[in-house]
Amino acid sequence: MASTANPMQVMKKKLEGKVVIVTGGASGIGQTAARVFAQHGARAVVIADIQSEVGKSVAKSIGDPCCYVQCDVSDEEEVKSMIEWTASAYGGLDMMFSNVGIMSKSAQTVMDLDLLEFDKVMRVNARGMAACLKHAARKMVELGTRGTIICTTTPLSSRGGQSMTDYAMSKHAVMGLVRSASIQLGAHGIRVNCVTPSVVLTPLAQRMGLATPDDFHTHFGNFTSLKGVYLTPEQVAEAVVYLASDDAAFITGHDLVLDGGLLCLPFFAPS
């Protein structure tokens, strides 16, 4: 008779007993990550997001141990309060997945850079990440927790592009933040890493016109060396779980790239 056991019940739960915060957890990669973290045995998964109705619905669908907290990461006081509440409510903080990110609606080329949109993107993507990392680190140090902080970046954090200049700049800033923090927080046993997915089939990608795997291959098939596959939110979430787990106990300051070989493509290829 075939076994009906849940595969996650058979697998090792890599976040057993951990208290975890996911910013941007109401949708996209963050929502999937919250579900995967709960499946991996997290004691508490706090979804921190500005999308209150969606966030509450996601937390309810995941069930115990998940909850939703309203938080605008561009407001440092809200970030601090959210982290304080989490540590007080659940008796600690083991992991921060700083995942929230936005893009401008326009192309944002250098010569047509809308600086109001630029400020908005930098406020969320760079300043917001810094606030999350700062206050998560402070709480972990205060509690003597050898925790882990993981930020979401993009291949544009190490490359330029024909557009999205403000987005690329904001993600370059995140990479610098991660590398600096990994050096400064190592003395406290806190590991800081980032995960760098290329295009994932999420609501953000859908707003770019990528609603299906076929759309992905049409627009980005030539920009990966690995053919016939595409990146899913679940794969990104499992990469984050790895970085947060004891399996990665000696990894800090690392950029775990999930790009199908995009960054390895040659600058010049024979015709």
From Swiss-Prot:
<feature type="active site" description="Proton acceptor">
    <location>
        <position position="167"/>
    </location>
</feature>
<feature type="binding site">
    <location>
        <position position="99"/>
    </location>
    <ligand>
        <name>NAD(+)</name>
    </ligand>
</feature>
<protein>
    <recommendedName>
        <fullName>(+)-cis,trans-nepetalactol synthase NEPS1</fullName>
        <ecNumber>5.5.1.34</ecNumber>
        <ecNumber>1.1.1.419</ecNumber>
    </recommendedName>
</protein>
<dbReference type="GO" id="GO:0016491">
    <property type="term" value="F:oxidoreductase activity"/>
</dbReference>
<dbReference type="GO" id="GO:0016853">
    <property type="term" value="F:isomerase activity"/>
</dbReference>
<feature type="binding site">
    <location>
        <begin position="24"/>
        <end position="30"/>
    </location>
    <ligand>
        <name>NAD(+)</name>
    </ligand>
</feature>
<feature type="binding site">
    <location>
        <begin position="49"/>
        <end position="51"/>
    </location>
    <ligand>
        <name>NAD(+)</name>
    </ligand>
</feature>
<keyword id="KW-0413">Isomerase</keyword>
<keyword id="KW-0520">NAD</keyword>
<dbReference type="InterPro" id="IPR002347">
    <property type="entry name" value="SDR_fam"/>
</dbReference>
<keyword id="KW-0560">Oxidoreductase</keyword>
<dbReference type="Pfam" id="PF13561">
    <property type="entry name" value="adh_short_C2"/>
</dbReference>
<feature type="binding site">
    <location>
        <begin position="200"/>
        <end position="205"/>
    </location>
    <ligand>
        <name>NAD(+)</name>
    </ligand>
</feature>
<feature type="binding site">
    <location>
        <position position="171"/>
    </location>
    <ligand>
        <name>NAD(+)</name>
    </ligand>
</feature>
<feature type="binding site">
    <location>
        <position position="167"/>
    </location>
    <ligand>
        <name>substrate</name>
    </ligand>
</feature>
<dbReference type="InterPro" id="IPR036291">
    <property type="entry name" value="NAD(P)-bd_dom_sf"/>
</dbReference>
<feature type="binding site">
    <location>
        <position position="167"/>
    </location>
    <ligand>
        <name>NAD(+)</name>
    </ligand>
</feature>
<comment type="similarity">
    <text>Belongs to the short-chain dehydrogenases/reductases (SDR) family.</text>
</comment>
<feature type="binding site">
    <location>
        <position position="154"/>
    </location>
    <ligand>
        <name>substrate</name>
    </ligand>
</feature>
<comment type="function">
    <text>Bifunctional enzyme that possesses cyclase and dehydrogenase activities. Functions as a non-oxidoreductive cyclase to promote the formation of cis-trans-nepetalactol. Functions as dehydrogenase to oxidize cis-cis-nepetalactol and cis-trans-nepetalactol into nepetalactones, metabolites that are both insect-repellent and have euphoric effect in cats. Binds NAD(+) as classical short-chain dehydrogenase/reductase (SDR), but does not utilize it for its redox-neutral cyclase activity.</text>
</comment>
<feature type="binding site">
    <location>
        <begin position="72"/>
        <end position="73"/>
    </location>
    <ligand>
        <name>NAD(+)</name>
    </ligand>
</feature>
